[in-house]
Amino acid sequence: MALTGAPTAPLHEQRAGGAGRVGAPAVMVRMRVALLRHALRDTDRAFWIWFAGGCGLLLALGTVVACGLDPDLGAALLAAWMLGWVVGPLVSGGDEALRAEMFVATGLSRWRLGWALLTSSVVGVAPVVSAVAVLGVVAVGVRGGVLATLLAVVAAAAQLAVLLTVSRVAVGVVGVLVRYRAGAVLAGAVTGLALALPSQGWALVAALAARDATQTLAVATRAAPSGWGLAAAEAAGRGAWGLAVGAVVALLALAAGTFALWCVLLQGRTTRRGASIRPRRLLSARGPAGATVRAHLRSSARDLVQINRFAFALAYGLFFCALPLLVGWTGMLPWAGAVFVVMAAMVWSNQYGRDGTALWLQLVTPGARRIDLLARQGTFLLATGPLALVLTAGLVAAAGTPASTWPYLAAALAAALGAGAGVTAAMSVLAAVPTTDPHRRGGDVLASGGDARETGTTYLTMALVVGLTLPALVVARLAGWWGAVAGVATGALCCYLLTRVALRHLDEQGVELLTLLRHGRRPTAGAPGAVPGRRPVELTGREQAVVLGAGILGTLMLFPQGIVPAVILRGGDPTTRSWFLALHVPAAWAWPVVAVMITLGATLYCVSVWRYRRAATAARGTAVPVPADA
């Protein structure tokens, strides 16, 4: 089926006399449907798709209800949806199943190609969930009568079109920026700020409330493009048809303008200038370990995607800890170094997956696996450690942090560096997610080929690093500077043990890992060419839901609702209750609530680990098939 202006119909359609002329949009829609159907056949990917879709659907229904009850709150939530459409693809790597580079040989103009790609982008879970969310505009229009409802339906459709086109433009602009080092740093900083704002939104809300700016915020959310549909529905309800029609026309014009801009950006992806080759200074290092470390440092400095993610981690740490300055609180500022290390571990958690099939070099070279893994850890420590130390020391001096806080900072930094080095190595081997090989990436540098599994791996890495850092903080709370010693010991122990686990897995299942990175899936049992070993742990959708759900709930109950309130209560009368349940109940019930939360969290953790270990035990000893061409 050709993707040209007048495609040739299949032979059986021509004989039947049917109109076999199928346009490019219809073909790409079918391709997207086929890709989605194929993804749902994979148990692992299907679980993440349905899990994310279910959570998104709940949020979308909440947005519809909020728009119907409180339009001000609904406008703020619609703004959050637009922010999510802008930031989400940047974090996940563009999320382009069909890329413009794939259709260069079809002869389609950039306008027709852009229209076909945009049309096909409505196929998926995220657009459907977003379509439910923008029904909040219709919920507001229903109160104004039949005509207002009809106009609200048009406004909701235009609002959805704006979400799709603005998201594409954001990915396209950042994709252009990350082709240059300065642009990659700028794009990473903007993404870090965009993600830090929701994380520390309480500071922004408190600052606005202190200045009595809630009404100004309500006006601003309606003035933003995300609120134009809601403003049109409200105007139609009160009979201001000129304003209502004008808002809808503005939405349509914005959708058309962003679509045109995206088509212009597509031109740069389908045509490319020749690259200039400049001689590079030769590496000089003593021994294979030093040479490998320097090679990884150089490749990281030249990889624009890695530069972008490193800048994101640094910007997130700075903005996350600096936003409380809006309410005059400097207490979080010195923690920017530790937060930066945690975020850097997140973006470092899929090293082998991002390098792709280059793993075969380590598999066929005797002794190279150990050297390469240790060099990757050394690269992480050299790239993050000195910068985190300078950042922490500088912000301690700038904020005038009291000396009583220094043991906590030292403990957190030491433990986070060691745990980050160990966890990133283990996750890169045990939970590798295949992506597009670097030499096969297209014009969109962000489109690395990852999916929701890579996002889940990054968040699991963050939870593990934070969890392994907490014991050192507890020791610092109880014994002062001994917490720093505990942090060094904890970090070193975690790094040593997790490195051993990763090396053992590489030795035993390195071929299976290469198969995963090459073919996008692990080998299935019973196929020809099986080799002795352990079958990869495969969980059913129900088991995945239990393991993941128990792990997430256990994390929420054990740390935010258990350990953190206990530390606050131990320090005296809490002044900030935030969302800690134990701080909102009467004083007599505070410690019992903490005990219940810690018990429930630990129990859920045990359930999650037990279910996973049971599946791992069942997989142990089963033959692992490897394709003959692996």
Regions inferred by a protein language model and the residue ranges of each:
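Catalytic phosphate/nucleotide-handling subdomain of diverse soluble enzymes
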Residues: 360-366
